[in-house]
């Protein structure tokens, strides 16, 4: 698992925001070459991103770059510019199907070999934000071993579906849930869509908690104020950790050791799926702790 509770976007042509990247406590910082950069600014943004890959990650965040999709004819130029040391992954905008992913995998391998980077070291993150992308989410996710996460993009999805984007998000429910299920089926992390009403903290937290229950483990963020609540919501609570420790202890001592398939804990049945879920919670907490400790040393 890669810790991705917060995926914070910075326009690739915004020198001021990039200069603050090392101070930004997001798990993932994504330098953007797509929608937040006007066409005329793309060449400048590519240069700026390439020059700041190591700097942006010097505060301990993992660095991704969002690239333009193949249909724009800008993808190769983006990749030629940014595949260098310091880059951990690329996010492919408007992923339409597995052929898009395979083509990206091939290009990344060619660049890794040409530039002396470890083959397979650069991960792929898929932005699922069209009707076609939603339908092909699972085939796309398994099209390359590099794929480690899927982001649901609500803004472009609602545009493609010709519906209004709302804070309540009822119009997104099918696609949002489908993306989370596709990610889990492929063994990837599901990253929730950006919440555009960034000043409405209460609504953001409510929406994020709902997404967590759909299976999302992180969120694409557009404002620094969203980082702290995202970390809080996507990190198992102390109560959850205590519950998980208790489940593991009781099941191992009273179940596994005595040949029982189910035991009782806090008045509820605990069987193998509950036990495995508890172990997953503890593993997540351990990985988050290791990630945060590494950040402090950066």
Residue ranges with predicted function:
Residues 1-298:
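Expand to "…catalyze enediolate/carbanion chemistry for C-C bond making/breaking, isomerization
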């Amino acid at each position: 698992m890669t810790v991705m509770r917060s995926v914070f976007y910075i326009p690739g042509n915004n020198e001021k925001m990039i200069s603050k990247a090392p101070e930004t406590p997001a798990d993932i910082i994504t330098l953007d070459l797509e929608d937040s950069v006007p066409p005329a600014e793309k060449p400048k943004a590519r240069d700026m991103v390439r020059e700041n890959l190591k700097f942006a990650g010097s505060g301990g965040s993992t660095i991704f770059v969002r690239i333009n999709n193949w249909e724009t004819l800008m993808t190769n130029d983006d990749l030629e510019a940014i595949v260098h040391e310091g880059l951990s992954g690329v996010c492919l905008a408007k992923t339409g199907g597995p052929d898009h992913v395979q083509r990206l995998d091939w290009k990344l391998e060619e660049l890794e070999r040409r530039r002396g980077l470890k083959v397979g070291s650069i991960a792929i993150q898929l932005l699922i934000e069209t009707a076609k992308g939603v339908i092909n989410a699972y085939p796309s996710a398994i099209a390359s071993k590099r794929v480690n996460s899927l982001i649901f993009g609500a803004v472009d999805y609602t545009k493609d579906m010709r519906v209004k984007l709302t804070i309540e998000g009822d119009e997104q429910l099918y696609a949002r849930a489908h993306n989370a299920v596709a990610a889990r089926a492929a063994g990837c992390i599901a990253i929730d869509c950006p919440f555009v009403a960034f000043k409405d903290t209460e609504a953001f937290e409510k929406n994020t908690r709902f997404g967590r229950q759909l299976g999302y483990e992180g969120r694409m963020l557009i404002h620094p104020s969203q980082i702290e609540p995202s970390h809080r919501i996507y990190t198992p609570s102390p109560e959850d950790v205590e519950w998980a420790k208790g489940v593991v202890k009781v099941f191992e001592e009273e179940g596994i050791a005595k040949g029982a398939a189910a035991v009782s804990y806090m008045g509820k049945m605990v069987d193998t799926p509950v036990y495995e879920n508890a172990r997953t919670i503890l593993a997540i907490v351990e990985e988050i702790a290791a990630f945060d400790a590494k950040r402090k040393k950066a």
